[in-house]
Amino acid sequence: MKKTRTANLHHLYHEALPEDVKLTPRVEVDNVHQRRTTDVYEHALTITAWQQIYDQLHPGKFHGEFTEILLDEIQVFREYTGLALRQSCLVWPNSFWFGIPATRGEQGFIGAQGLGSAEIATRPGGTEFELSTPDDYTILGVVISEDVISRQATFLHNPERVLHMLRNQLALEVKEQHKAALWGFVQQALATFSESPETLHQPAVRKVLSDNLLLAMGTMLEEAKPIHSAESISHQGYRRLLSRAREYVLENMSEPLTVLDLCNQLHVSRRTLQNAFHAILGIGPNAWLKRIRLNAVRRELISPWSQSATVKDAAMQWGFWHLGQFATDYQQLFAEKPSLTLHQRMRQWA
């Protein structure tokens, strides 16, 4: 009898884990991973020990690239995404994540907080957060376990102050030269060990790399400070409104929601909702609702854990009752017919 796969494809897993369960990546071989991706669902699964759900917001064929190094309780990576995304993320527990965006190009957001040239994102492990990233976006990531920070606290002059910021801030303002130095160090490490991954099998090499990374991080964090956002209060409120709207849509998958439903649930007028979507995303709430639902259908079609056996099953589950129009809208967003998406899953996981 074939085993049935089950999973929630549209929400992250938040159940409390026993204290003796450790999810910290710790490896001595297979330290380096490189991947090229052509689908947002596939790309969201690339980062070791993370939970992620991505929604593709701009139409086109997605292209992503990902490189990571796994050290002893430290994770370093570079992520490139070709199209604008909305991301739900959850880092492995008992750690701190640092997101270091490029200093040039259109900025991304963590929650309602913009990430400019002198800013980095940060979140404790086990805490869900949301990223919004534009087309053609590169971000570096560093994840350090709390145990490493505790054992190596000397790399911070004032660890209590820094830890307080890391636990309570979505983003930090840092000196541009410190951010640039860390960016260069991480890029060089990724390039070097991607070409010679076997070098990281040596404990001495891993130790030197880890220690130098901690020193570079310490230099940046010592002079970091909370951000006083330049974005207007109204725009920050709009971003929070969009986040609440998405959660409501995904929590009510049994019925096709409308703009009126969103207004009633979020206690805002239609004009406020329109203003929020146009100010932040440049599209109306109707178009956004359709894209979020199309992304949900795509996860149902492509995931090996899906229970949907046909395109019709997946489409009807998310309120697309006119299958011809659904297929047209799906192909416009993902540059691919829904039947092809399902065929790829069946061929790979049959």
From Swiss-Prot:
Residues 243-344 form the HTH araC/xylS-type domain. One of its GO terms (molecular function) is DNA-binding transcription factor activity. Keywords: Activator, DNA-binding, Transcription, Transcription regulation, Virulence. Pathway: Amine and polyamine degradation; ethanolamine degradation. Induction: Part of the 17-gene eut operon transcribed from a single promoter, positively regulates its own expression, induced by ethanolamine and adenosylcobalamin (AdoCbl, vitamin B12). This is the last gene in the operon and has a second weaker promoter that is constitutively transcribed at a low level. Subject to catabolite repression; expression is substantially lower during growth on glucose than during growth versus succinate. Catabolite repression is overcome by adding exogenous cAMP to the glucose growth media. Residues 260-281, 311-334 bind DNA. Disruption phenotype: Mutations prevent expression of the entire eut operon. No phenotype during bacterial growth in vitro. About 10-fold outcompeted by wild-type in mouse intestines at 2 and 4 days following oral infection. Loss of induction of pathogenicity island SPI-2 in mouse macrophages. About 25% reduction in survival in mouse macrophage assays. Bacteria growth is not enhanced by exogenous EA in macrophage survival assays. One of its GO terms (biological process) is ethanolamine catabolic process. SUPFAM superfamilies: Homeodomain-like. NCBIfam families: PRK10130.1. Activates the transcription of the eut operon, allowing utilization of ethanolamine (EA). Positively regulates its own transcription. Probably binds EA and vitamin B12 as effectors. Competes with ethanolamine ammonia-lysase (EAL, the first enzyme in the EA degradation pathway) for adenosylcobalamin. Ethanolamine-associated signaling mediated via this protein, but not EA degradation, impacts S.typhimurium survival within macrophages. Binds the promoter of ssrB and eutS in vitro; in mouse infection models binding to ssrB probably induces all 4 operons of pathogenicity island SPI-2. Expression of the eut operon allows this bacteria to use ethanolamine (EA) as a carbon, nitrogen and energy source. It relies on cobalamin (vitamin B12) both as a cofactor for the ethanolamine ammonia-lyase (EAL) activity and to induce the operon. EA enhances bacterial survival in macrophages in a concentration-dependent manner, suggesting it is an important nutrient in infection. PANTHER family: HTH-TYPE DNA-BINDING TRANSCRIPTIONAL ACTIVATOR EUTR (PTHR46796:SF12), HTH-TYPE TRANSCRIPTIONAL ACTIVATOR RHAS-RELATED (PTHR46796). This is HTH-type DNA-binding transcriptional activator EutR. It comes from Salmonella typhimurium (strain LT2 / SGSC1412 / ATCC 700720). The gene is eutR.
